[in-house]
UniProtKB/Swiss-Prot annotation:
UniProt family annotation: Belongs to the dGTPase family. Type 2 subfamily.
Source organism phylogeny: Bacteria, Pseudomonadati, Pseudomonadota, Gammaproteobacteria, Vibrionales
Keyword terms of this UniProt record: Hydrolase
Location of the HD domain: 67-260
Protein name (database record): Deoxyguanosinetriphosphate triphosphohydrolase-like protein
GO molecular function: dGTPase activity
Length: 448
């Protein structure tokens, strides 16, 4: 293994798939500063302000987070992680040179999520079951590299390392899909979401992009990078990829912290969770998580979170975020007895300490149990799921009549070339905000 103070990276990680020539007088920005600007100014990013995070836009309470504010918070946490890693482990500064790179990855990480959150994702996956499936992370890569009209054919034309950082699951959906497909339903209202959760990965339609991203890697690294975390323990279980780049590992930790802590704050403010639920399901476990700081301060943090005073609650939330963030370190991706990656971007990942990893899992499980799976939230998700499936069914019945002109042209081109025309319909729906999807549904199905 190379010494970490001798880390060097191939210049090809700053390549773009298209060697564009933009009219930008005296532009002194770095590659990753330009990537950040492209993402921030994109229509796909703006639409996140009207897409469900946990509580759908239009809720009676305007305090909650949307996909947009969540992405901004993930970016803030991600850059905070990079800053503290540079101080604690200066030998890795050559790997963590650009704050703009981490901002770009974090800002873009949710850009492919469809309207109505996971309900919309399940709906599109079901409707695309015979045409390559649908998954939010795969859609993110597709938007960044093909769909967003910053360029004619290459989406935002982001740098290779930025796309590698967004690539959470480096395998095709059909490679990780369960061997046994659930039973189809005769009525979409009878669809059980648990049966149609998509596997995590990249569409076969985007094989060219995945191959381009991984091109600088050796054949050995490519093979190791695409291995799975575990074998399927049943025919109905999707497999998961095991590895990701160091940038992606930081983004994923930032995403998990934002989900486990900031979505918790929304739930407290809106009265969805109580102090007793918190005490029984979280505080009692964090008091014994093995982290001395948490064990000593969890009671004080609990008092602040449920004090009813906004500044106290914010201080409690900030304390948890800081405790998690400062427990992250860079370690080798593989274990001592395993083959190691040749690429420095894959050889190292960011990890929480074991005790704080457990603490974060407790927080995420609490949010999942009392917020995500709250019956009111599930009814809203179910409604969105039905809206998306009904829209897809209508558009697919007569695309040349119902699709907008640009999408109609893309659909025709796909049909004529033998490409996946159903993907065009999925792309159109996935790009909708919750409100736009609701209005289109009303136009199609609500009597005048």
């Amino acid at each position: 293994m190379n010494k970490t103070n001798e880390i060097t990276l191939s210049p090809h990680w700053e390549d773009r798939i298209s060697n564009e020539q933009k009219l930008r007088r005296n532009d002194q920005r770095s590659v990753f500063q330009r990537d950040r600007a492209r993402i921030l100014h994109s229509a796909a990013f703006r639409r996140l302000q009207a897409k469900t995070q946990v509580h759908g836009p239009g809720s009676a309470n305007d305090f909650y987070r949307t996909r947009l504010t969540h992405s901004l918070e993930v970016s803030q946490i991600g850059t905070g992680v990079v800053a503290q890693l540079k101080l604690r482990q200066p030998e890795f500064r050559a790997l963590l040179t650009s704050t703009s790179l981490m901002e770009s990855i974090c800002l873009a990480h949710d850009i492919g999520h469809p309207p109505f959150g996971h309900g919309g994702e399940i709906a599109l996956n079901y409707m695309m079951r015979d045409h390559g499936g649908f998954e939010g992370n795969g859609q993110t890569l597709r938007i960044l590299s093909k769909l967003e009209p910053y360029t004619e054919h290459f989406g935002m034309n982001l740098a290779r390392r930025t796309l590698l950082g967004v690539l959470k699951y480096p395998a095709f959906l059909d490679q990780v899909h369960s061997t046994e497909r659930p039973q189809e339903v005769t009525n979409v209202r009878h669809l059980k979401s648990i049966d149609w959760h998509p596997p995590k990965g990249v569409y076969r339609d985007d094989a060219d992009i995945l191959n381009w991203i991984l091109k600088p890697l050796s054949d050995v690294d490519k093979a190791l990078f695409s291995t799975f975390r575990f074998q399927q323990d049943s025919q109905n279980t999707h497999r998961k990829t095991r590895f990701k780049s160091i940038d992606c590992s930081i983004m994923e930790l930032a995403d998990d912290i934002a989900y486990g802590v900031h979505d918790l704050e929304d739930a407290i403010v809106m009265g969805i969770v109580t102090r007793n639920q918190w005490q029984e399901s979280v505080a009692s476990k964090l008091a014994e998580c093995g982290d001395e700081w948490f064990e000593a301060n969890i009671e004080t943090i609990s008092d602040k979170l449920f004090s009813g005073l906004q500044y106290q609650r914010k201080d409690g939330i900030g304390s948890i975020v800081n405790a998690l963030l400062t427990s992250i370190t860079i370690k080798p991706t593989t274990f001592n007895d395993e083959a190691e990656f040749e690429s420095e971007l894959l050889r190292w990942n960011a990890f929480l300490s074991p005790s704080m990893s457990y603490a974060l899992e407790v927080l995420k499980k609490f949010v999942g149990q009392f917020v995500i799976h709250n019956s009111e939230m599930q009814r809203i998700e179910y409604k969105g799921q039905q809206i998306v499936m009904e829209i897809f069914d209508a558009l697919n019945s007569d695309p040349e009549r119902l699709l907008p002109e640009n999408d109609k042209r893309e659909w025709r081109e796909a049909k004529e070339s033998g490409a996946n025309a159903h993907r065009v319909i999925a792309d159109y729906i996935a790009g909708m905000t919750d409100g736009y999807a609701q209005r289109l549904y009303n136009q199609l199905f609500v009597p005048i």
